[in-house]
Amino acid sequence: AAIGGSTLILITTLLLAVVYRKRSSSSKLHLMNSTSSKVEKFLEDYTHQMPTRYSYPELKKITNNFADKLGEGGFGVVYKGKLARGNLVAVKILDQSRHSESQFMNEVATLGTIHHFHLVRLLGYSFEGFRSALLYEYMANGSLEKFIFVEGDVLGWEQLYSIALGAARGIAYLHDECNRRIIHFDIKPHNILLDADFTPKVADFGLAKLWGKGSDHISITATRGTPGYVAPELWSRNLGPVTDKSDVYSFGMLLLEMAGRRRNIDVRASRSSQLYFPEWAFKLIEKGELETRLKERGSTEMGSEDEEKVRRMTKVGLWCIQYNSNDRPSMSRVVQMLEGNGDDVTNPPMPFNSTPSPGSTIAIFYRRLFVDGLTGS
């Protein structure tokens, strides 16, 4: 009887497990079908202004069965491909998650409907059941990131300045010139891509938001962007509304990294005063020592025109990262400041609003966390 009872309990448990698994699978399938229907409805609404749609078998042919992997990011894997007419493309295969669904629709709703010389073109897409992909124009030189954080100044100052100006023009178009204003929310070196001629194009609109022209701010439910490039008001709503000035802040941090040819936070800096580049650069500008100090750490010759470019990039960058968003210029104004036209950029006020200074606070934190931890001291 005891054995019979144990057997009955075991059978009952197994039956319950089977029922649970079926219900769980059914629930998961229902969720995925619901997501699929949502995306298909979205694509239906945008059909009249969409790039080309490809099937999954066509993607396999375009990428030679996904043979040439270009890179991998938070939302999926990117492969090199070739269209039938000979155009090279970058094919991003998105992972299966709610975040990738959101990125897919964001990219299609933004890049799929606009065109600008300094924005990466979305050439096509694929959506079949649980598989989704985006096809972009191929950018032969990859991201700006791999050129500004390396030993030996691969890009000359004139070329670097041209890249900064081109990226600024692309972002200004998003804010002020396209039919529906767009806030990118993830401006950083990794998302500035370079073609074979080093023409810069803003990429990765997975976090972007459309912004009505009649609105003075945008509502978001969570912080967006990459730490180190995120504007203060995105961390705390007490610091004011979220607007296109959040992109201006991110561009300012990018511009400072280009001017310094280093990350804004350098945990290996020989002096704590140099750990946070924006603060160090501000102090050097105040003392009139910026070009001299940057010459000391650069590996290429710097003429007077190069010095002017570095000085202008740094000043504009510091204007862009002002703590109060109202004190930051618009991206259209940033373009004008970089274009110069003989006008000097006025010295920016102190961008930071904290005591102790951000540099000293960051220095203590990062040295304890990284430097001391890595060296064992």
Protein language model regions, located:
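Conserved catalytic-loop aspartate of Hanks-type protein kinases
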Residues: 247
